Curated annotation (Swiss-Prot):
The keyword Chaperone does not apply. The lineage of its organism: Eukaryota, Metazoa, Chordata, Craniata, Vertebrata. Residues 275-383 form the GOLD domain. The gene is Sec14l2. Keywords: Activator, Cytoplasm, Lipid-binding, Nucleus, Transcription, Transcription regulation, Transport. CDD domains: SEC14. Monomer. Its main location: cytoplasm. Carrier protein. Binds to some hydrophobic molecules and promotes their transfer between the different cellular sites. Binds with high affinity to alpha-tocopherol. Also binds with a weaker affinity to other tocopherols and to tocotrienols. May have a transcriptional activatory activity via its association with alpha-tocopherol. Probably recognizes and binds some squalene structure, suggesting that it may regulate cholesterol biosynthesis by increasing the transfer of squalene to a metabolic active pool in the cell. This is SEC14-like protein 2.
Length: 403
């Protein structure tokens, strides 16, 4: 039994009745607490009454704290409205709304420098509520229950800039909020035009996703347009994605419905850095350097780093060792990222590097040019691994099955 209205086992029927009784005190505060709504929370917690009740009560608190009932009338700041990519466009064959996330042109760093994380998260909450409102309207229009959405993730242009740690952490907060407060609303998620970096990016966000959500993700191959047309009618799919829908002015991307983002002009910036915690702090003596080694076992891994110095600049470069087991000078190693001086005492530095071959990579903080001052450097370095299942999926031509 699926645990949905009209397909409940006697045990599930009993659980639903008991659940309604247990949470009857909070039901009047919720927009539409019908059986469909209550079953979403039960399915999300495998019909465990205690866990389902705890989840729903936490959601009621969330709605109160974030003033969710009035969120649709709230207007996000101008920079978010103009540059946060994505949008709702059309319906799938069952009448469920379709939401597009456009990853490539998203300027994550620019958004976090121009808007507060709270406003960005609030905008995503507002999007969720607008989608639920659209489901209610579709239910009335079609005369059948619509309670889920289809998502299309356009990953063309996904790059190292999108792996910036504060951006990934902010996106993780949104995914956690979505999982905790909008359970069982995702019907399926299509990933299209995924580049080689996708398995690394997916591995970063996977911990924030429930098993159920992961099963609904379909990474599509070269035939992605054909696959989308099996789920969405051509007149409901933009020309850009293989359908026939255009804007009134003929634009094939349907830009009146989908925001395609873009680089944010610096005049919007309200800060030039995001506060970060660092895992290590070292003192680099005058006239010397400090090396940190990381073993990379296979190609495609990504090194991600952030660092800051105190009082003065510091040199930084990345090298690949040519001999194992012994410390090597910079000149004896293969230079991967050229050494240069960074004003990291003024603005913290961050970066990423895709490792094209296995070996021992050395991140070197250079103070050899300073004969007077030692440098205090705080840093965090991580090795980001690709998700193997996603990688295998992408290696299969036209992979289009849930992982």
């Amino acid at each position: 039994m699926s645990g949905r209205v009209g397909d409940l086992s006697p045990k599930q029927e009993e659980a639903l009745a008991k659940f309604r009784e247990n949470v009857q005190d909070v039901l009047p505060t919720l927009p539409n607490p019908d059986d469909y709504f209550l079953l979403r929370w039960l399915r999300a917690r495998s019909f465990d009454l205690q866990k389902s009740e705890a989840m729903l009560r936490k959601h009621v608190e969330f709605r109160k704290q974030k003033d969710i009932d009035k969120i649709i009338s709230w207007q996000p700041p101008e920079v978010i409205q103009q540059y946060l990519s994505g949008g709702r466009c059309g319906y799938d064959l069952d009448g469920c709304p379709v939401w597009y996330d456009i990853i490539g042109p998203l300027d994550a760093k620019g958004l976090l420098f121009s808007a507060s994380k709270q406003d960005l998260l609030r905008t995503k909450m507002r999007d969720c509520e607008l989608l639920l409102q659209e489901c209610i309207q579709q239910t009335t229009k079609l005369g059948k229950k619509i309670e889920t959405i289809t998502m299309i993730y356009d990953c063309e242009g996904l790059g190292l800039k999108h792996l910036w740690k504060p951006a990934v952490e902010a996106y993780g907060e949104f995914l956690t909020m979505f999982e905790e407060n909008y359970p069982e609303t995702l019907k399926r998620l299509f990933v299209v035009k995924a580049p080689k970096l996708f398995p690394v990016a997916y591995n970063l966000i996977k911990p924030f996703l429930s098993e159920d959500t992961r099963r609904k993700i379909m990474v599509l191959g070269a035939n992605w347009k054909e696959v989308l047309l099996k789920h969405i009618s051509p007149d409901q799919l933009p020309v850009e994605y293989g359908g026939t829908m255009t804007d009134p002015d003929g634009n094939p991307k349907c830009k009146s419905k989908i925001n395609y983002g873009g680089d944010i002009p610096k005049q919007y910036y309200v800060r030039d850095q995001v506060k970060q915690q660092y895992e290590h702090t070292v003192q680099v003596s005058r006239g010397s350097s400090h090396q940190v080694e990381y073993e990379i076992l296979f190609p495609g891994c990504v090194l991600r780093w952030q660092f800051m110095s105190e009082g003065s600049d510091v040199g930084f470069g990345i090298f690949l060792k040519t001999k194992m087991g012994e410390r090597q000078r910079a000149g004896e190693m293969t230079e991967v990222l050229p050494n240069q001086r960074y004003n990291s005492h003024m603005v913290p530095e961050d970066g990423t590097l895709t490792c094209s071959e296995p070996g021992i990579y050395v991140l070197r903080f250079d103070n050899t040019y300073s004969f007077i001052h030692a440098k205090k450097v705080s840093f965090t370095v991580e090795v980001l691994l690709p998700d193997k299942a996603a990688e295998e999926k992408m290696n299969q031509q036209g992979a289009d099955t849930p992982k």
